[in-house]
């Protein structure tokens, strides 16, 4: 199998495309800060960085609500999202119209088998994570094999598309411990001039290079500039295990845009107002007694007096310090209520047709799909074309 990389290693090719991704990566992190900070943290190293919790939870609720609605529509539980049919005209042309019922029965058997495979897999759990990345960052990469569905966030892959939006090239970056690599490959690495024994004690970067050639995708993996043996792969484009998704499509751009990005202004305003209200309320809750230094009542007398005690003094010498900002707080609360209502509408957190139940009917699934389509201006249609159809074809191919 031949790969044309113009003399570049997969690592070099990855680094050359990272710059084109930087803008989208930065926007994704900004959106994650005010929704679910742990989803796309500032640091992508192996150590867990300290994450700052937002003062409001509307953003997180919105992302989870919208992701859940997409999940229930794209992969509804105990409900097939597809129906296999055969072209009746083709049967008539071949004079086999009498086999229609028998063929339909066979197709129902295939449908049930596919649906059962989906139910027992981890696909729904992985897809929910992927949908949250789509809502926040607008981009996610899925890898579907018989072992399950793997999710690559935006920080772990780069890609190129043509003007129409077809995927031309994908590179992923992962880390792996050297002991997980083939022993003969490790021996090959040790023979290199730039071999560092200390570095080989830590996790190593592995790059996967996926490239489209005509109607096929081919791929291989690389580590330390060397191709890893037995990592070659090939598949037809329509049944590829690599499913690259975007939320909001922009013509001519390799990456999509996140839904949160469109409402980030409201979320930032809500965050600032909630911080002011919370900090102001904490200051208002603090009780301080002021004592007239020229009066007959002494501060020490009050400080040492237990509850219900009788002490000598004058009430006029004592006052309670008040912030006096209740009017300002009420204005902020009104603005918070207005913004919250707008965001709840935008993220479909208002009353919906979906019941709080483990199973939903086909009618409810159709109503949710219609709600998503009407509210999100065709974004649901993009996901049906870029996820449901490739996912189903890949599942049938497996």
Which residue stretches match the model-derived regions?
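Extended, helix-rich architectural segments
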Residues: 1-190
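Structured, contiguous alpha/beta core segments that scaffold functional sites
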Residues: 12, 136, 144-305
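N-terminal start-of-chain detector that recognizes signal peptides
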Residues: 53-55, 104, 111-117, 214-215, ...
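Long amphipathic alpha-helical segments
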Residues: 70-88, 93-103, 291-398
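A broad, structural surface signal
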Residues: 108, 112-123, 132-136, 212-217, ...
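Generic structural hydrophobic/aromatic packing signal, biased to beta-strands
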Residues: 114, 142, 157, 270, ...
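Residue-level detector of alpha-helical recognition elements and their boundaries
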Residues: 129, 285, 357-358
């Amino acid at each position: 199998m031949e790969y044309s990389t113009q003399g570049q290693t997969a690592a070099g090719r990855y680094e050359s495309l990272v710059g084109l991704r930087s803008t989208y990566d930065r926007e994704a992190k900004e959106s994650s800060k005010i929704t679910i900070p742990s989803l796309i943290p500032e640091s992508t190293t192996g150590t867990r960085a300290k994450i700052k919790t937002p003062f409001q939870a509307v953003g997180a609720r919105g992302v989870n609500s919208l992701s859940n609605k997409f999940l229930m529509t794209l992969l509804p539980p105990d409900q097939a999202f597809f129906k296999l049919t055969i072209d009746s005209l083709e049967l008539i042309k071949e004079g086999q119209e009498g086999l229609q019922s028998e063929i339909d029965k066979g197709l129902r058997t295939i449908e049930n088998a596919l649906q059962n495979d989906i139910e027992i897999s981890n696909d729904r759990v992985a897809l929910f994570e992927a949908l949250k990345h789509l809502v926040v960052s607008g981009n996610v990469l899925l890898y579907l094999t018989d072992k399950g569905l793997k999710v690559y966030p935006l920080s772990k892959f780069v890609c190129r598309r043509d003007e129409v939006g077809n995927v031309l090239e994908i590179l992923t970056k992962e880390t792996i411990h050297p002991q997980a690599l083939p022993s003969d490959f490790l021996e090959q690495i040790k023979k290199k001039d730039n071999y560092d024994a200390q570095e080989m004690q830590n996790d190593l970067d592995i790059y996967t290079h996926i490239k489209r050639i005509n109607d096929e995708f081919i791929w291989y993996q690389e580590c330390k500039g060397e191709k890893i043996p037995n990592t070659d792969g090939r598949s037809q484009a329509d049944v590829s295990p690599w499913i690259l998704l975007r939320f909001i499509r922009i013509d001519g751009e390799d990456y999509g845009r996140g839904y949160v990005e469109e409402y980030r202004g409201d979320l930032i305003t809500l965050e600032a107002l909630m911080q002011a209200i919370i900090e102001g309320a904490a200051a208002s809750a603090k009780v301080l007694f002021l004592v007239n230094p020229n009066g007959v009542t002494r501060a020490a007398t009050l400080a040492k007096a237990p509850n219900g005690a009788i002490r000598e003094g004058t009430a006029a010498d004592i006052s309670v310090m008040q912030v006096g900002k209740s009017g300002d707080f009420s204005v902020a609360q009104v603005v918070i209520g207005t913004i919250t209502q707008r965001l709840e509408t935008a993220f479909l957190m208002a009353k919906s047709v979906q019941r709080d139940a483990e199973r939903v009917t086909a009618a409810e699934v159709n109503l949710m799909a219609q709600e998503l389509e009407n509210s999100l201006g065709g974004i649901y249609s993009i996901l049906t074309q870029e996820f449901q159809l490739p996912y189903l074809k890949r599942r049938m191919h497996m």
